[in-house]
Amino acid sequence: MATASTTTVYGGDEINAIVLDPGSYTTRIGYAGDDFPKVITSSYYGQVKNDKKKIFGESINVPRANYDIKPILKESIIVDWDAAIEQYQYYFDQQLKVVGPEQPILITEPIWTETSYRQQLVETFFENFEFSGIYLAKSPTCVSFQQGRSNCLVVDLGHDSVSVTPVIDGICLLKSSMKTNYGGKFLSNEIQDYLIDTKKVVMEPSFKIKSKIPTTYPDPPKYELKNNNTIPTSSSSSLSQSFLEFQNEKIYHNFKEILEVPEKNSSSGTTTTTTTTNKDSSRLFELPTGQSIVIDRFKIAESIFDPTIYKFTNSKLSFPPNNGEISITQANEYRPLKRVRKNDDEEEDSNQSTPKPEVNIRGISQLISHTLSNIDIDLRASLANNIIVTGGVSLISQLTERLYLELSNNNPGLKIRLHAVGNSTERINQAWIGGSVLASLGTFHQMWVTKEEYNEVGVDRILNQRFR
């Protein structure tokens, strides 16, 4: 692999920057300027009890006795730094052949990172990997660059979280952003509750199945497990709960692929579910044991818009109420110019004189409508006309159509326009692709924070002045 020399790292087009997009479920790594990441890997790792070795990539799916699966990130924030460093080092060395002192790195980050986390992130990549330059880019900003829309509203439906972020002039308005946990993991918990706790079906990962005979629920499954001493049977305690849950998550992921958001009709300013036949909503889903079960694909998908609609049998799987309002404290908050600027006292008095009813839970359309209603009126029309929908959960059938209808009904004074990439591979990699576009711009060389600047001014000043 050709690498850029130190003198060309900040000279424009010749740099060979690395782009890292760490997500809760998947991590993406590649070269700036490429269309897609070179590495797309799980954000989990495996580790055998009493063994320091960490296992990454597809190898984590190999069953082992006393073997746990652990997350590296939660809500797109690193929670296991040792594992993160080891995983990134593995892919930097083995697949990308990175030469840290000769290459800069752009790292995407969610909008809700705290200052202490960002400090550790910068210090880790300068000290442990010795990159020549670093830039931290907000994920919504990267998505906006991928779409070529400097002013937009980025709606990201991810695994651990759902977020709505206004982006103005390529900069995220943190105080106007919203986030809930009603994303892919929330849907997985509903599916788990439906299959295991409500229907009491037998869950066996596919790697344990030797043969099976098709059956239909409520008839019991007919299958034979592999007779292999290296693969413990269901009654064995050798397979850890975390490993089994990780394998079951793949079943839930396949389940989510057949979900569909039900249509809605507008009636007197409200939305009501249209009458659908059981044939429309019901689908057969085959489990690894060969047992097929009829599922209502509308009911679970509806929880994206109304998180209260599904009633959990197992309360431990339910999520606490979340209205999406978050408190983000980062220095140098960007404030776009307004047509008429009020002073702080007038704004405070205005907010106090208009009390708002308390809302405990918000679905996706409510999050977006609430964000639009709270944004400056001069920005509202532009953002409503440039709503970018991204993330794996957004691929659920009919989601964007339903979202457009609800937003149009809830915001009659605005022209709603959704932008969702038709290519599913491109949509789930949208933040990385945007980072690739951003880091490959000839004018971006002045944005890199060098190792020399880091040593000279320190991480605190870098965060305050260079990264927004």
UniProtKB/Swiss-Prot annotation:
Q: Which InterPro entries match?
A: Actin (IPR004000), Actin_CS (IPR004001), ATPase_NBD (IPR043129)
Compositional bias annotation for Polar residues: 321-332
Quote the cellular component terms of the Gene Ontology held in the record: Ino80 complex; NuA4 histone acetyltransferase complex; SWI/SNF complex; Swr1 complex
State where it is primarily located. Answer: nucleus
Name the Gene3D superfamilies on file: 3.30.420.40, Actin, Chain A, domain 4
**Keywords noted in UniProt:** Activator, Chromatin regulator, DNA damage, DNA repair, Nucleus, Transcription, Transcription regulation
Where in or outside the cell?
Nucleus
Matching Pfam families, A to Z? Actin
- Which biological process annotations from GO are given for this protein? chromatin remodeling; DNA repair; kinetochore assembly; regulation of transcription by RNA polymerase II
Subunit field text: Component of the NuA4 histone acetyltransferase complex, of the INO80 chromatin remodeling complex, and of the SWR1 chromatin remodeling complex.
Q: Which family does it belong to?
A: Belongs to the actin family. ARP4 subfamily.
What task does this protein carry out? Chromatin interaction component of the NuA4 histone acetyltransferase complex which is involved in transcriptional activation of selected genes principally by acetylation of nucleosomal histone H4 and H2A. The NuA4 complex is also involved in DNA repair. Is required for NuA4 complex integrity. Component of the SWR1 complex which mediates the ATP-dependent exchange of histone H2A for the H2A variant HZT1 leading to transcriptional regulation of selected genes by chromatin remodeling. Component of the INO80 complex which remodels chromatin by shifting nucleosomes and is involved in DNA repair.
Protein name (Swiss-Prot/TrEMBL): Actin-related protein 4
Supply the source organism for this entry: Candida albicans (strain SC5314 / ATCC MYA-2876)
